[in-house]
Amino acid sequence: MTGVQTCALPIYGIRSHGLVYVPIYCEHLRCGKVNTDAEPVVLSQDGSVIAVDADSGFAHPAIDIGFDKLGPLAKAMGCAVLTVCNSYNCGVLGYHVERLSADGLVAIGFTNAPASIAPAGGRRPVVGTNPVALAVPGVSGQAAFVLDQSASVVARSEIMTRVREGRSIPEGWALDAEGQTTTDPAQALKGSMAPSGGYKGFGIGLLVEVMAAALSGATLGIDASPFSGTEGGPPRTGQCFLALSPDA
């Protein structure tokens, strides 16, 4: 599923998370950020709440295992919850919730990431870009709409793309290490991402941190190794998905 998503994203017009990520994934498989022998397992199922451990591997296989149970449970009980811990980057969160909406479910997803957003007025990153996504089912197995947005003005991967392409970033996307606005993507990666809507974006980041990391038992963003470069071991971040049946 990791490969399927990576190949599909450029079709959606999402270049920053598509095929450009293949070299990064390969690098992280070689350096140990991703466990090449990962065997995700269901840790527990209590009523309609499922917990999966990704074993420091890609999030996608762990999410797949959880979704096998999540959809049927949501339809049988009206709503169900899946948490995933100890996972690597899950790619575009909206892709996952859209899969649930294709099964006729309203789906909400959360995923935390290594810290890259500082509190309003601060300089030290505390939470990650921490996206939240919503998918609503439509007709003929198609989603009526999918909302996928991060707690930052723009995804961190967009900054990484600008570094690779040697292009500047718009003012207001990120701050340098001194907390000043910068248009240099390299300086932005040394500093912090600008929260969307100021303190409100940081608040969304905290909400996602609770849902994706605290509830799942994953590593908090402030302690997780980065999704870029080779420093540190597996980031062991987490995800949380809520599935609701409109027929309940």
Kindly label every feature range from the protein language model.
Residues 51-139:
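A generic, well-ordered mixed alpha/beta core segment in the N-terminal half of proteins
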Residues 18-71:
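Active-site cofactor/substrate anionic-group-binding motifs, chiefly glycine-
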Residues 191-248:
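Internal helical hairpin/lid segments
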Residues 2-9:
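Short, small-residue-biased leader/transition segments that mark boundaries at the very start
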Residues 15-33, 161-163, 168-170, 177:
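Acidic, glycine/proline-rich low-complexity segments that act as flexible tails and inter-domain linkers
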Residues 8, 22-27, 68-71, 98-101, ...:
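Predominant activation on well-ordered alpha-helical scaffold segments within soluble catalytic domains
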